[in-house]
Amino acid sequence: GKPVSFIEDCAVPLDHLAEYVDRLTQVFARHGTRGTWYAHASVGTLHVRPILDMRRDGAAKMRAIAEEAAAMVREYKGAFSGEHGDGLVRSEWVGWQFGPRLSRAFEEIKDLFDPAGLTTPGKIVRATRMDDATLFRFPPDHRTHPIRTGLDWSAWNVQSDPATGALTPAGTGGDPA
């Protein structure tokens, strides 16, 4: 698997940060994974990306981990989107952060300025589910096909995704797509 960004923006009050980290680490363990951690502990935001294989059972684990993380963030009176914004991944969690009154106001404003719903569909208002497979770059059943090249690149020790051409340097936690 690879680190997947979907809960990396949660923020909790500093008094609860250590407990949140411990509990979230336990959540990862229950789902057979771990996370990569970095960022701004001084303001209660530790960016974390659970390592998931989105080609297999990653979407189900993503949903379960996100729900548990959201419950903890609510318990600690934190924010599911502390810094980076909401987008497709976190928009479904906006409602409980702002409450029904502001959520309705967001919808009214969106409808006034974008009555056809053409700009940023599924973001902030009338959100799609974060695990909607139709929104994934590659569907869960995506398969790659080996490409035979005319040259031997094995000495370079990199992995190339035949679908995207993206190269993953060895030792960075990547795996072939």
Regions found by a protein language model. Name each.
Residues 3-33, 54-82, 86-176:
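Phosphate/diphosphate-binding loops
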Residues 34-54, 89-90:
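Histidine-centered divalent-metal-coordination microenvironment in nucleic-acid enzymes
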